[in-house]
């Protein structure tokens, strides 16, 4: 690694710490030429597939958008933040494991539905009513009957 002080290319790692989430590493380094110390951070770079909307537009995947969808569906429901985070991690892992450059928004929606159904039935019905564009009480009845089975 190049020293930020003297641009020498040879540095030594003198300390390494893995952060709790195990997604990043902090390293203290010392330059072999000027002996100055500096810190570097390493983090894996993952690329999520682009999301293809119903109208054909392609947008960048958004973790925050997914989290907001979960929070909206689970508003005032007894589900911990940890369980929500775990559900989102499972969805993101599935998206990465697909190995695709693009994924239809409908596929993400179905993954969300599957996770919500496991977390909280009321949240599942809330999300489904918007996602599937319910038009009347019969749509709700059909879904509630399905959930009760």
Curated annotation (Swiss-Prot):
Recorded hits in InterPro entries, A to Z, give: ATP-cone_dom (IPR005144), NrdR-like_N (IPR055173), RNR_NrdR-like (IPR003796)
For this entry, list what GO says about its biological process: negative regulation of DNA-templated transcription
Return the cofactor note field: Binds 1 zinc ion.
PROSITE patterns in the cross-refs: ATP_CONE
GO MF annotation terms: ATP binding; DNA binding; zinc ion binding
Give start and end of each ATP-cone domain.
49-139
Keywords (A to Z) from UniProt:
ATP-binding, DNA-binding, Metal-binding, Nucleotide-binding, Repressor, Transcription, Transcription regulation, Zinc, Zinc-finger
**What are the start-end ranges of the zinc fingers (unnamed)?**
3-34
Q: Which cofactor does it need?
A: Zn(2+)
The UniProt entry, under PANTHER family, shows:
TRANSCRIPTIONAL REPRESSOR NRDR
NCBIfam families from the xrefs? transcriptional regulator NrdR
State the family it belongs to.
Belongs to the NrdR family.
Q: What does this protein do?
A: Negatively regulates transcription of bacterial ribonucleotide reductase nrd genes and operons by binding to NrdR-boxes.
> What name does this protein carry?
Transcriptional repressor NrdR
Q: What is the lineage of its organism?
A: Bacteria, Pseudomonadati, Pseudomonadota, Betaproteobacteria, Burkholderiales
């Amino acid at each position: 690694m190049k020293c930020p002080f003297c641009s020498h290319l040879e540095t030594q790692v003198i300390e390494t710490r893995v952060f709790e989430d195990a997604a990043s590493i902090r390293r203290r380094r010392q330059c072999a030429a000027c002996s100055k110390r500096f810190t570097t951070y390493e983090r894996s770079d993952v690329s999520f597939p682009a999301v293809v909307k119903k109208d054909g537009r392609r947008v960048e995947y958004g973790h925050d958008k997914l989290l907001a969808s979960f929070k909206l569906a689970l508003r005032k429901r007894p589900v911990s933040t940890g369980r929500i985070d775990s559900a989102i991690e499972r969805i993101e892992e599935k998206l990465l494991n697909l190995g695709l450059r693009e994924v239809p928004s409908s596929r993400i929606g179905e993954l969300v539905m599957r996770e919500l159904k496991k977390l909280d039935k009321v949240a599942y019905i809330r999300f489904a009513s918007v996602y599937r564009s319910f038009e009347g009480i019969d749509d709700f009845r059909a879904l509630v009957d399905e959930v009760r089975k």
